[in-house]
Amino acid sequence: MQSYTVRPAKGIRGEITVPGDKSISHRSIMLGSIARGETTVRGFLRGEDNIATLNAFRAMGVVIDDDGETLRIAGKGLRGLAEPTDVLDCGNSGTSMRLLTGLLAPQRFYSVLSGDQYLRRRPMRRVVEPLSRMGACIHGREGGEKAPLAIVGRDLKGISYTSSVASAQVKSALMLAGLYAEGETRVTEPHLSRDHSERMFRHFGADIENGPAGVVVRGGRELEGRDIIVPGDISSAAFFMVAALIVPGSELLIRGVGVNPTRTGIIDILTAMGGSLELLDQREVSGEPVADILVRSSRLKGIEIAGEVVPRAIDEFPVICVAAAVAEGRTVVREARELRVKETDRIAAMATNLRAVGVTVTESEDGMDIEGAEQIAAGTVESFGDHRIAMSMLIAGLTAGGDITVTDTECIGTSFPTFFPLLEKVAAR
């Protein structure tokens, strides 16, 4: 089990580019594989989660060439996938498993999805139940709640579904099934979740309507291959945003970051805390808004975080907790129960780790209260096998009173394979 020790930094300075967006990378493989003709993808994130998706489609007969810079996907059309001869291994990727469940449910073959020990603990009924209402035949442990999932492909019918949680994975699974279903598939949510699927469906020519009331997909229309440029992942950029804010004497430019408004909760939260973040050269690339982000060290203050901003920053909460740990006053997080069913229980994991380095934290059922500390203490903490927990605590170490060691850091490769080189590049010692 690999551990990593980070020393306090004297500044976070320079200019970086973070790897491609994980969510968009997943979807580019999926839609490119079931489109007609060739799809090219530049900026694809070669993290373990996305490679799991890529390998799944290769196992279903899709030819995907990778020269290290550009992926070329020879699309099979809606009905061109082949039955896999073995279990499709999703690794640690909840996105791969949940979206593939929606895509595989209407295929005319049998398939099985599994993953690592962490993924096999995560809840899957949230996609199995609505897909079953569409006519899908899906079997899993604990009544469809846990993987492995065995899927017997069937013809599906569109439904109107109101999700109890704002989850892009649930929504996207139903949208993918809806491409094949008879009639309309309509999905509404309590708050708008990230809309990468809607944007990419439109880019590939799907019959789709979306707005504040939800999304409607009409089945049967073939998709056409497209050229895609994947922007930098704001969830990866978030670690370096927080680093530059909390380490005195910092100024960092992060180039080419996706700033989709359904993902910019992290910017809104850090700005509300008093952070200096400036969006430069705003433009649109492959249907997604992109900008360069200039971050300067700032004195942060505690705030209350709840409501519609929560799903727009759901993946960034571990590192938001680090910002809160060094902010003046108390930060209160509520309506974030979804954090308990991520790769690990992120509320419990961050509470445990922050307490281990001297921060006062009180858990609630759907969030936490964090009392800002004058300085984070040195110590040893756990990743809990969760890439975002590991990276967040390494960022905490940049402003601690001594070294922080994080155990089991191999998991960082699932989403951010270049994290360590970038950290060493910008951290002044």
UniProtKB/Swiss-Prot annotation:
One of its GO terms (biological process) is amino acid biosynthetic process. One of its GO terms (molecular function) is 3-phosphoshikimate 1-carboxyvinyltransferase activity. The keyword Cytoplasm applies. Keywords: Amino-acid biosynthesis, Aromatic amino acid biosynthesis, Cytoplasm, Transferase. The active site is at D315 (proton acceptor). Its EC number is 2.5.1.19. It is found in: Cytoplasm. It holds the Pfam family EPSP_synthase. Its main location: cytoplasm. It catalyses: 3-phosphoshikimate + phosphoenolpyruvate = 5-O-(1-carboxyvinyl)-3-phosphoshikimate + phosphate. Disulfide bonds: none annotated. Transmembrane segments: none annotated. Gene3D superfamilies: Enolpyruvate transferase domain (3.65.10.10). PROSITE patterns: EPSP_SYNTHASE_1, EPSP_SYNTHASE_2. NCBIfam families: aroA. Belongs to the EPSP synthase family. Catalyzes the transfer of the enolpyruvyl moiety of phosphoenolpyruvate (PEP) to the 5-hydroxyl of shikimate-3-phosphate (S3P) to produce enolpyruvyl shikimate-3-phosphate and inorganic phosphate. This is 3-phosphoshikimate 1-carboxyvinyltransferase.
